[in-house]
Amino acid sequence: YLALARQLVVAGWLLPFPLAIFLLLAFGGVDPSLWGGFHLNILLALVAIVASFPLGVLLALGRTSSFPVLRVASTAYIELIRGVPLITILLMAWLVLPDFLPSFAGLDDMELVYRVMVAFTLFTAAYVAEAVRGGLQAVPRGQVEAAQALGLGTVAILGFIVLPQALRAVIPALVG
């Protein structure tokens, strides 16, 4: 039974390749002029992921902070952004923000790309913050107490004890 299952899996992976080659040769590939959107999409995703990670970590730290103003502001931002659909944020970046921001001469298309980068970054940061907050809560309180007993300060405890363990715990959630 397992041998047949393995053969079916191998066949399922190998049979689409000749079919794909036939389709590409018979009907032609994608016109290179249509690849511009793909590159822009990859650029937007990379910028959003890289820029949202530090912002998300700061928001998660703010949400778990003992300072009420910081905690409330972080919580309000995260809940507001997570409660609004991404398409709404993108439409606001496209249609509403130009009315409030000064226009730079001749950079309208690039301005739109920058606005979308910021919108994706702010949206992704809220979700990263929630994942990191879960990781921060997963670190046992005894770790912090042990670090305090050793005389470490708050920044050292966060940087050397809490954040490495929290980020290690949330890698699957961030990647998936």
Residue map of PLM features:
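Transmembrane alpha-helices and adjacent helix-loop boundaries
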Residues: 1-176
